[in-house]
Regions:
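Structural recognition of the beta-strand scaffold that forms the well-ordered cores
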Residues: 11, 31-33, 83-88, 118
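Substrate-binding/active-site groove segments that recognize
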Residues: 24-43
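Mid-chain, well-packed structural core segment of small domains
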Residues: 73-102
């Protein structure tokens, strides 16, 4: 006999609760969803498939933000679209808060105008570049300037 999986899931959601953000359970262990342990101290983790699903969800959110705020980004070539997505994913797009990629007014204007060297220079002179370091930032600057990701 096979158990009723739908009924079990409903019962567990009632008993455990469903929390869609990380929280500490009654014993202080980091948990998410319906009692899913993510606390590394107890061996908690998420499987790669869940990580990929979260990444897909985040990328779709970033695309929606960019489509609404700067629809011209879709006219960029593939590499420069990837850079815009990467930077927005990394820094966020938060018009009502400082620190997001939306604050890069000169760089965004350079991208929109096809002034690739200016866009790269704008990235290099930013706080973001200093914070993440050249190892992470320089490949994106070069990609903006050349339209190629170098390995």
């Amino acid at each position: 006999m096979t158990y009723d999986r739908v009924a079990l899931k409903a019962r567990l959601k009632l008993e455990e609760g469903e929390v869609l953000h990380a929280y500490q359970d009654s014993l202080g262990w980091w948990t998410i969803g319906v009692g899913h342990l993510i606390d590394g101290r107890k061996g908690g983790a998420i499987p790669p498939g869940v990580s990929d699903a979260l990444l897909e969800w985040d990328l779709a959110r970033v695309e929606r933000q960019l489509d609404q705020a700067i629809p011209w980004w879709r006219a960029l070539d593939d590499i420069r679209q990837q850079v815009v997505m990467d930077l927005t994913f990394n820094m966020g797009w938060a018009p009502n808060a400082p620190g997001g990629f939306d604050d890069f007014h000169d760089t965004l204007a350079a991208l929109q105008g096809g002034r690739w060297a200016d866009a790269g220079a704008g990235l290099r002179k930013s706080l973001w570049y200093r914070q993440v370091g050249s190892r992470r930032a320089e490949p994106l600057c070069v990609a903006v300037e050349t339209g190629v990701f170098r390995s």
